[in-house]
Amino acid sequence: MRAPAIGALFFVIFVPLIIIMGDYWDHRPQKETAVLVGVITQNQTEEMAREYLEELAFLVDTAGAEQRAIFTQRLDVPHPKTFIGSGKLIEVREYVKEEEIDMVIFDDELTPSQLRNIERELNCRILDRTNLILDIFAGRAQTAHAKTQVELAQYQYLLPRLTRMWTHLERQRGGIGLRGPGETEIETDRRIIRDRIAKLKLQMTKIDKQMMVQRKNRGKMVRVALVGYTNAGKSTLMNLLSKSKVFAEDKLFATLDTTVRKVVVENLPFLLSDTVGFIRKLPTHLVESFKSTLDEVREADVLIHVVDISHPNYEEQIGVVETTLRELGGADIPCMLVFNKTDAYSYIKKDDDDLTPSTKENLSLDDHIEDWNRSHPGSLFISALKKSNIDELKDQLYQKVKEIHVKRYPYNDLLY
């Protein structure tokens, strides 16, 4: 082919492509921008506030937004009218206006009156932690069951907040905090919302009964449930033990629908459930709405509490899970404590001549293993991703399941 022909071909094929791609990059969807707000109080130390806001930032990322700034204020208690003081509110308002921020997210559940007052002052979309979690759940729900549960929780949250300054246009445009229960306008009659809640509760009653029948129909096989803080690696472990493909991702609430698989270890079968992860300040509406999902935990014979050992605040996360289990009525269920993500663990090693007191940041993985096996004998340390120490986990799990079979069922009634 002659050179002029090649040049002509370039202009015919590549120039239009370059123009198209340039137009795409100029008009590609932009992430919504968010400012985070938290308070330091008598009941929430500066360190706790920082940890909670880090988690809120992870939630924001999971929801698909971009965090631009964090504002904190030290108060005895949150301001009853605006959550934060007037001076801090002005500071946030100026930043929002100057940077053209889409939304401000508070790391606590705001009262309806606080929400209205803050919206009036900041003149932008206001979300709280509960609203954000509900929005993530709405985006994650796949089955009709999960969608019904989330929609019910959203409407229960929305009912006392119908006077929020959301316009019909905003709901049509969509965005974080605006997903879910349809094109509800500000002027929507409360009665319509209550009627919808009543219908959803009726649907959930039917779903709960169906789920209960399904659990009964599983026969006498032992039930094992994976529990833990969100993003601890439960789904990755589920995939490893069941040799199935359960959606696993480095995001909060990657699993929403409960997944149940039949697993066989050394010819002994049992049912393994992967459940929704727990989190600090889990909205009450979600706990109520996800009754049938959480029944998988309540009715389990054995719990595997999966902990992310690489998280700097894993001990507090353990406390959140244990508190939630108590509230669900599952505190007395035999539980295996499994520390996951050993491959991601890191620490700051002190020099031999460093005489300063050691902190938890200086503890090696071996130090943690020694401490936990002293206080909780039988604790396991694994990496589901790297498949390390999985055989020991299977051995312990086999012994637990076998013990329940032998104790509760005749030998000839075992399922093989």
Regions found by a protein language model. Give the residues of each.
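Inter-motif core of Ras-like GTPase G domains
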Residues: V287-H311
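Flexible beta-alpha connector loops of hexameric P-loop NTPases
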Residues: N43-E47, H79-T82, R140-A141, E185, ...
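C-terminal-of-GTPase-core extension/linker across diverse P-loop GTPases
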Residues: I20-L36, Q156, P160-A232, M238-N239, ...
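Positively charged N-terminal leader segments that act as targeting/secretion signals
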Residues: M1-F10
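Conserved nucleotide-binding/hydrolysis micro-motifs of P-loop NTPases
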Residues: I40-Q44, L75-V77, E109-P112, N131-L134, ...
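Switch I (effector-binding) loop of TRAFAC-class P-loop GTPase G-domains
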Residues: G219, S242-L268, T284-S289
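Conserved catalytic network of the ASCE P-loop NTPase/AAA+ motor domain
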Residues: R28-P29, V96-E98, K262-E266, L271, ...
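N-terminal accessory targeting/assembly segments
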Residues: I13-R129, I133
